[in-house]
């Protein structure tokens, strides 16, 4: 019989119960025990959903209060020494301080989990790091699953991926040298799981889909030789890309099974068809929301079943952390667009799709014929829908003039024209875009969407908020102002609602980091902009002040990366469609007198393929799509872009090729680490490295901000340096926002006087 299993499940709950409970706990409105009880109830629900879908094991250990890599830092005793906490006796408050910072320490750095929109907390390894096992996180969840009478499979990220994802801190050394100390701690943790009755243990090694150095790849042999001495069967899970280049190594490892992502890399199956142990086929897309064509999947699985017999397992391609919880609650979407609804599949539907595949493999297709027929009808309808394909969009792309994505003049000429009218001081200050989204703003938006607030009253509320934001910025003496984005629920969703080819869910939330969830738009058809989206808000904000007002758009690559994207045409084509649609908005802003326009691209690095060999092709089309979004603007219009969570030292030429007049970047959490590359690569345009971390409520000291600004001045000419926070301020409160910005402006004025 074929075994089915799940690699991981969403943590936040069907209605974001965990998020709201966490935030109440942080505000001291919820007792710790109440938070613990809610989390336990969520885990039980998750496991029961998996069991109801006939999964042979439920995944345990994947649930986390903030991040699974932070949990692993605690479990291995590798929490940052600078906090002074005891990992063996860590309180829940201390756990959250690691993630969010406290008055004495900034938060652990956060970055993208491979090429997804989930963020993990980056382990800080020191030469003196002393690992110590604390398996309580996993053991406690196993005990809960056992109490419910469930078959369970613990899930833990493997030692090589864990080390790879970290960074060296302090005295220079290679974190790879810590491996021999880390492995015995893993053995101790695994033994604790075995003592609780674990028969199979899933060890995730997604780093195998990267370009790992030879010594790291070679280390898999010795590491898994040690881990395999544990009295349990190990399932080595890979995902997010192909591991075919390591096929011989993986086939020889002393593990009991191997999981392959056959959605991202279906071609890799050929390299493993002679695998002699359990082969877990990841055939249901774990990162997107499209319904599978189950007949096509069975066409792949049935020959595999004939070869492998009971050694064939089936699963989603990766953890379902990246998909929304349940399609069935999307009643409005079903009423509005029945066809689109029929093409979608969320977490609960995916586990059911897996169950249909399992039944078909074990009992024949006829046993699930109705489900297979429904899957086929949906696939056929999607392939031929006129709602998806709009000939005029393809025509416009095909007929773009040569050089449409290039500015009229080089930066050196443009900046002279821009400076002539901008008349800004040295080290100009600005904000990235958003200001705090207060309860009042959210209430007004929700009331308007429900029809409880008229359009006139809603717009009056937004204008009042915009005026408040403008006045606060004037009081702080900022140089280039923003309107604060009060009218925007989300930097991608807002634009998606106003572009054709997009659809929206009501409950399609996925975790971004900690308690932060996002609700990605669904790009299902060709993209156009039917009417202006932001012009009247920016125009109104500009009417309130004599200072320069910056227009704010989200760029094509970020809209693509932070959406659930159609999978029937290349992503590059979708991205260029968005870029061309945005160019209409940019020209309308310019015509309305908004001549500083920011096109945010925080996700540009996240889109990089995991294998370096594929980078150039991506960077070429991503850069073209970005430049298309401002095609046709005049030289004296200043185009800004913003990037965050990014380590892009290795793609600086591509960033420069975007040819934005000003780039602002997130750098404070990594102590301006990004700027080391500027010593070698003379970035040609203006740049604003973030001088404080907006992900934490902590107000930076003047000394800290000055330290970062001076580091920036060492590598960026003062004439080309801007001063700004790391990112937008949407998630912050007003009190800390004012205090943080005041420190930033005061330090800037001090340095201006010094440099004058």
UniProtKB/Swiss-Prot annotation:
Which residues are recorded as binding L-methionine? Answer: 432-434, 485, 600
Query: What are the transmembrane regions?
Result: none
Summarize where L-homocysteine binds, as residue positions: 432-434, 485, 600
Q: Which Gene3D superfamilies match?
A: 3.20.20.210
Known EC number(s)? 2.1.1.14
Report the coiled-coil segments.
Answer: none
Q: What domain of life does the native source organism fall in?
A: Bacteria
CDD domains per record: CIMS_C_terminal_like (cd03311), CIMS_N_terminal_like (cd03312)
Q: Where does 5-methyltetrahydropteroyltri-L-glutamate bind?
A: 16-19, 112, 516-517, 562, 606
Pathway assignment reads: Amino-acid biosynthesis; L-methionine biosynthesis via de novo pathway; L-methionine from L-homocysteine (MetE route): step 1/1
Cofactor(s) essential for the protein = Zn(2+)
The Gene Ontology biological process terms listed for this entry are: methionine biosynthetic process; methylation
Catalyzed reactions? 5-methyltetrahydropteroyltri-L-glutamate + L-homocysteine = tetrahydropteroyltri-L-glutamate + L-methionine
Keyword tags: Amino-acid biosynthesis, Metal-binding, Methionine biosynthesis, Methyltransferase, Repeat, Transferase, Zinc
Question: A single Gene Ontology molecular function, please?
Answer: 5-methyltetrahydropteroyltriglutamate-homocysteine S-methyltransferase activity
Cofactor binding notes: Binds 1 zinc ion per subunit.
Q: Sorted alphabetically, which HAMAP family does this protein's record hold?
A: Meth_synth (MF_00172)
The entry sums up its family as follows: Belongs to the vitamin-B12 independent methionine synthase family.
What name does this protein carry?
A: 5-methyltetrahydropteroyltriglutamate--homocysteine methyltransferase
Q: Which organism is the protein's source?
A: Haemophilus influenzae (strain ATCC 51907 / DSM 11121 / KW20 / Rd)
